[in-house]
Amino acid sequence: AVMGIYDGQGTFEGTDRLSMAVNKDFLSYLEAKCKGENPRHIVFEGDRLFSATNLRYILDKYQTRICILKQSEEALHKRHMARGDTQSEKFLKGRKTKIDNIQKEFSGNSEIFWLNEISDTKSLSGKLWRWLSEDTL
């Protein structure tokens, strides 16, 4: 299952389009999934679901691969300018702090992927596809 809304509408897609209150429903979904058949391959990204609380729950119930995506400050700035977003410096700093804290807490269960060039993104895309299609973590 891929979590989020991907319909080509707007600057932000995926879990950014979900309600801020989505976590309760997400955890209920995960609970039902782990009791049912074939409880694997749940893919999500973004600020709504990528929280320490959710990751702790998932690590307790599922074989898990946590991928933390990073970019250089220069690449990140160019990306924000290109899409013309209006996220405040305070918001961006808060997201960085959140990811840094998650990275520290889950250092033994996470991998860092640097996505500064399109080739980095393509490489990670290939890895994700192999992990999902070969049923390996």
What are the functions of these language-model segments?
Residues 33, 37, 58, 105-106:
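Hydrophobic helix-cap positions at the C-terminus of alpha-helices
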Residues 104-137:
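NTP-dependent small-molecule kinase module
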